[in-house]
A protein has these predicted regions:
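Conserved, structured core segments of small domains
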Residues: 2-108
Length: 108
């Protein structure tokens, strides 16, 4: 994985993958039960510099996770280890390479 920052805390080029999860209302209770494991897994990836930002959609329909990875397939392989995915709680997962042009993930 490419770290989002160098040791001097300057921005460096990276490949960002936007991971979009969708959830079913039918799995809400199970997600509540597994959520501590899911968030612990994400926290480890944040500490490693792999997950850049994450959070649920306000309507509860899913979540967006921004990931620093070599490519979408690398991210897809990593996310197979997510406790939510392992428990079958993700209806669909979309992995799309995203090119930051301006803002928090760029020099502008």
């Amino acid at each position: 994985m490419i770290p989002p920052f160098d040791p001097d805390r300057k921005r460096v080029p990276m490949t960002v993958i936007a991971v979009e999860y969708t959830y079913s209302d039918a799995t809400a209770a199970a997600r509540d039960e597994i959520r501590p494991d899911h968030r612990g897994w994400l926290a480890g990836l944040i500490d490693a510099g792999t997950v850049l930002s994450t959070g649920p959609f306000a309507d509860g329909s899913g979540a967006l996770i921004l990931v620093s990875a070599a490519d979408a397939e690398t991210a897809r392989e990593l996310f197979r280890t997510d406790p939510f995915q392992q428990a079958g709680l993700v209806d669909s997962a979309r992995f799309t390479e995203w090119t930051p042009v301006m803002g928090a993930f760029t020099d502008r």
